[in-house]
Swiss-Prot record:
Listed GO biological process terms: apoptotic mitochondrial changes; apoptotic process; male gonad development; positive regulation of protein-containing complex assembly; positive regulation of release of cytochrome c from mitochondria; regulation of apoptotic process
Topology in the lipid bilayer: Single-pass membrane protein
Function: Accelerates programmed cell death. Association to the apoptosis repressors Bcl-X(L), BHRF1, Bcl-2 or its adenovirus homolog E1B 19k protein suppresses this death-promoting activity. Does not interact with BAX.
Name listed for the protein in its UniProt record: Bcl-2-interacting killer
Transmembrane residue ranges: 136-156
UniProt site (Cleavage): G153, G154
Keywords: Apoptosis, Membrane, Mitochondrion, Transmembrane, Transmembrane helix, Ubl conjugation
Modification after translation, per record: Proteolytically cleaved by RHBDL4/RHBDD1. RHBDL4/RHBDD1-induced cleavage is a necessary step prior its degradation by the proteosome-dependent mechanism. Ubiquitinated by the ECS(ASB11) complex in response to endoplasmic reticulum stress, leading to substrate recognition by the segregase p97/VCP and degradation by the proteasome.
Organism: Homo sapiens (Human)
Length: 160
């Protein structure tokens, strides 16, 4: 990896290609050169200078690759925080639904106890303490009328 440095805004501005584009183009027409010039390109070729230039170019390309990698990964890192917040929100909602389930479970236990008490009271051996069916039904309807809004609100919160 290359050295750590701040992310550039425009990667193309720092490349060697851009520097080459800034130089004015020169056109040479064959046959218009000086006759004294030797056209052998291998005569002026310095292999050490070429290798040093290629190392610099390779290092520059590695830096550009690192910058592109960082710029491509940056949105993913931002999305990780959103995913974490979303999962925390789901955990909080799940915790709330567990509380609602506990409340509904306690209501069901209360209804079961009420039913057992009514049945025990109904089967009482003492005929003077008997309750008529109309009184029991009226009491159950009143209880249902009181608990229906509470249960519908709990169900609404559970499904929310």
């Amino acid at each position: 990896m290359s050295e750590v440095r701040p992310l550039s805004r425009d990667i193309l501005m720092e490349t060697l290609l851009y520097e080459q584009l800034l130089e004015p183009p020169t056109m040479e027409v064959l046959g218009m050169t000086d006759s004294e010039e030797d056209l052998d390109p291998m005569e002026d070729f310095d292999s050490l200078e070429c290798m040093e230039g290629s190392d610099a170019l390779a290092l520059r390309l590695a830096c550009i690759g690192d910058e592109m990698d960082v710029s491509l990964r940056a949105p993913r890192l931002a999305q990780l925080s959103e995913v974490a917040m979303h999962s925390l929100g789901l955990a909080f909602i799940y915790d709330q639904t567990e509380d609602i389930r506990d409340v509904l479970r306690s209501f069901m236990d209360g209804f079961t106890t009420l039913k057992e008490n009514i049945m025990r009271f109904w089967r009482s051996p003492n005929p003077g303490s008997w309750v008529s069916c109309e009184q029991v039904l009226l009491a159950l309807l009143l209880l249902l009328a009181l608990l229906l809004p509470l249960l519908s609100g709990g169900l609404h919160l559970l499904l929310k």
